[in-house]
From Swiss-Prot:
Pfam families: Ribosomal_S10. Involved in the binding of tRNA to the ribosomes. Belongs to the universal ribosomal protein uS10 family. This is Small ribosomal subunit protein uS10. One of its GO terms (cellular component) is ribosome. GO terms for molecular function: structural constituent of ribosome; tRNA binding. Keywords: Ribonucleoprotein, Ribosomal protein. Part of the 30S ribosomal subunit. It comes from Shewanella denitrificans (strain OS217 / ATCC BAA-1090 / DSM 15013). It comes from the Bacteria. PANTHER family: 30S RIBOSOMAL PROTEIN S10 FAMILY MEMBER.
Amino acid sequence: MQNQRIRIRLKGFDHRLIDQSTAEIVETAKRTGAQVRGPIPLPTRKERFTVLISPHVNKDARDQYEIRTHKRLVDIVEPTEKTVDALMRLDLAAGVDVQISLG
């Protein structure tokens, strides 16, 4: 796997789970002899929702909610076969979305 790169993007609502999963990925890659760049924190997406509390009148009575989507990026440069095999066997938290691309 010469001159290749694995780019891993992690997304989730809980930043602690993302940081924990990122640490597991980095530790696994370094243990198998690959060079790691990252974790790089990407901008957090904040979605805000405003909901009327009252069913009929009182437009002033509102609640506001927010969902934050945290993202991290990890690049693994020149991965070995052991690195790819170890990453495939890695079991990450359920609240983390993982996207892997080869480049």
